[in-house]
């Protein structure tokens, strides 16, 4: 029934029409409003899937919630996988959010490989996307890396599917509430000891109150612009990166006068050159490299455990022997 509220959603229509319905998929089912709505969407669109739930045991109610989800899936005739991971006190870990996320994604990876699932459906929505983008802004991410989460993404070769990125949390909750469908309200989502919760409960309301407008949509527009910029930069960088050669010293990126005429593109090409060798270069490091290239002055720099040589006509990453 809920799905009728979204049956005229063109983005969902395009998304689901692109899927191979002969294949089987995996659904990350937390029991929250977003993943539960996604479960009903998949059923209504004729997608064959198995639900997987991870119970970390963080809350006293988590065991019963997992049992309730198992019962729900049994009633709906949806295959269900329950994975229990007992964590005595999540606050004993400084980065528990990322630790838990990494565990889930590794579980998804194993299941997809072992049971040949074509991909994993994730319930990330527009509010999650806005939070991700703002977090990256504050972290100083490159303009080409503010694109947020991808509707079609990958993790170690498995496909990640996020059809709800254009739908807000309010729309999801209203849809479920209107049809009296119960969902788990995870208290940790509002626990301000966690960064995401602080952003959700404090930062976004504060910024919107001061600014006087909803800031989520502009952030989503920023992500779209960033994705287009990233695509453009990659196209422009490709001819230069194709000139990388291996020599007796290491990998050599030629940098001619044509490229140096555009500082932004030069630094992007260098950034991707380093990244392809497993090196993440900071903004300051890239600026230093660019300054030496412009002055045609040689330099010997360290980037993590590698030596970078800036020459008059290019950049070399020394090989490790």
Swiss-Prot record:
InterPro entries: Rossmann-like_a/b/a_fold, TilS/TtcA_N, tRNA_Ile_lys_synt, tRNA_Ile_lys_synt_N. Its main location: cytoplasm. It is found in: Cytoplasm. Its EC number is 6.3.4.19. The N-terminal region contains the highly conserved SGGXDS motif, predicted to be a P-loop motif involved in ATP binding. Ligates lysine onto the cytidine present at position 34 of the AUA codon-specific tRNA(Ile) that contains the anticodon CAU, in an ATP-dependent manner. Cytidine is converted to lysidine, thus changing the amino acid specificity of the tRNA from methionine to isoleucine. This is tRNA(Ile)-lysidine synthase. It comes from Chlamydia muridarum (strain MoPn / Nigg). The gene is tilS.
């Amino acid at each position: 029934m809920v799905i009728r509220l979204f049956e005229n959603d063109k983005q969902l229509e395009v998304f689901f029409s692109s899927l191979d319905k002969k294949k089987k998929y995996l659904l990350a089912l937390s029991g929250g409003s977003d993943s539960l709505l996604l479960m009903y969407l998949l059923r209504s669109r004729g997608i064959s899937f198995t639900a997987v739930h991870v119970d970390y045991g963080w809350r006293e109610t988590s065991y019963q919630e997992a049992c309730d989800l198992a019962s729900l899936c049994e009633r709906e005739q949806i295959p269900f996988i329950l994975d229990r991971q007992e964590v005595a006190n999540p606050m004993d870990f400084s980065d528990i959010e990322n630790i838990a996320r990494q565990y889930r994604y590794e579980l998804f990876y194993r299941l997809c490989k072992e049971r040949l699932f074509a991909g994993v459906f994730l319930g990330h929505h527009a509010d999650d996307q806005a939070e991700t983008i703002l977090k990256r802004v504050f972290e100083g991410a490159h303009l080409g890396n503010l694109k947020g989460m991808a509707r079609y993404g990958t993790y170690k070769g498995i496909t990640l599917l996020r059809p709800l990125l254009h739908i807000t949390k309010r729309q999801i909750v209203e849809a479920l509430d209107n049809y009296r469908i119960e969902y788990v309200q995870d208290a940790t989502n509002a626990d301000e000891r966690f960064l995401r919760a602080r952003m959700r409960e404090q930062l976004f309301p504060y910024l919107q109150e001061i600014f006087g407008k909803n800031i989520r949509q502009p952030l989503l527009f920023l992500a779209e612009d960033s994705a287009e910029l990233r695509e453009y930069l990659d196209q422009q960088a490709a001819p230069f990166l194709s000139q990388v050669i291996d020599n007796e010293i290491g990998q050599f990126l030629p940098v001619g006068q044509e490229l140096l005429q555009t500082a932004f593109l030069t630094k992007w090409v260098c950034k991707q050159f380093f990244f392809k060798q497993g090196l993440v270069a900071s903004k300051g490091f890239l600026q230093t490299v660019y300054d030496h290239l412009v002055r045609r002055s040689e330099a010997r720099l360290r980037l993590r455990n590698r030596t970078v040589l800036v020459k008059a006509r290019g950049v070399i990453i020394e090989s490790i022997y």
